[in-house]
Curated annotation (Swiss-Prot):
Transmembrane segments: none
Record's subcellular location: Cytoplasm
A Pfam short name: RimM
Subunit details: Binds ribosomal protein uS19.
Described purpose of this protein according to its UniProt entry: An accessory protein needed during the final step in the assembly of 30S ribosomal subunit, possibly for assembly of the head region. Essential for efficient processing of 16S rRNA. May be needed both before and after RbfA during the maturation of 16S rRNA. It has affinity for free ribosomal 30S subunits but not for 70S ribosomes.
Family label: Belongs to the RimM family.
A GO molecular-function descriptor: ribosome binding
Entry keyword annotation includes Chloroplast: no
GO terms, biological process: ribosomal small subunit biogenesis; rRNA processing
Name of the featured protein: Ribosome maturation factor RimM
Domain PRC barrel per the UniProt entry, residue ranges: 94-165
Domain notes: The PRC barrel domain binds ribosomal protein uS19.
UniProt-listed InterPro entries: PRC-brl_dom, PRC_barrel-like_sf, RimM, RimM_N, RimM_N_sf, Transl_B-barrel_sf
Amino acid sequence: MNSLENLILIGIIKSCHGIQGHVILRSFTEPATKILERNLVNESGADIRIKLISQNAKGELICTFNDITTRNEAENLKGYKIFCLRTSLPELEEDEFYIADLNHLRILDQYNKEIGKIKNILNFGAGDIIEIEFLDKTTKLLPFNKEFFPTITKDYVILNYQTKV
C-alpha cells in the first residue's frame, strides 16, 4: 500500500460514455494520452487497467476501465481518482512543477511576508488558476503565470502585488 504523499493525482473519471461501460477520463498529463504510459493505481495503491477507445473533441479520453462492462457499473465511477507513483514520474525541467507539489504552499509578498497559502489549483480548459486563501480567510482566483507568481520554490511562492489583484 502507498501513502497518498507518494502518489500523484493524474486523472479523474468524469462520467460514463455509452452502454458498454466506457468512461470519460480527464487526464492531467500533457498530452492527455501520456497517462496511458504510467502504472496507474487508486488511492489504496491497487493497480488500475485502462485501455484507450478514443479521444473526444475536448481532449478527454474515452476508455475501458478495469473489467467494467455496463453503463450502470461505469456510472458508479464518476469522480474516481487515478494516481501514479511519484517515483515513476520524469524529472522536471526548470520552472516546471507538479500540481500536487503546489497545493498548500505558503504565499509570500514581495517583502517575503507570509500572506496566505495555495488552497487549490483549478483548470477549466484555458490554463491553471490558483485559488489563494489569505490569512484573513478570504479567497481569490488568479491565473498561474509568471506575472502573478514570479518566484516558485518547493517551499513557497511569491505573489506579485505590483500586478493588479
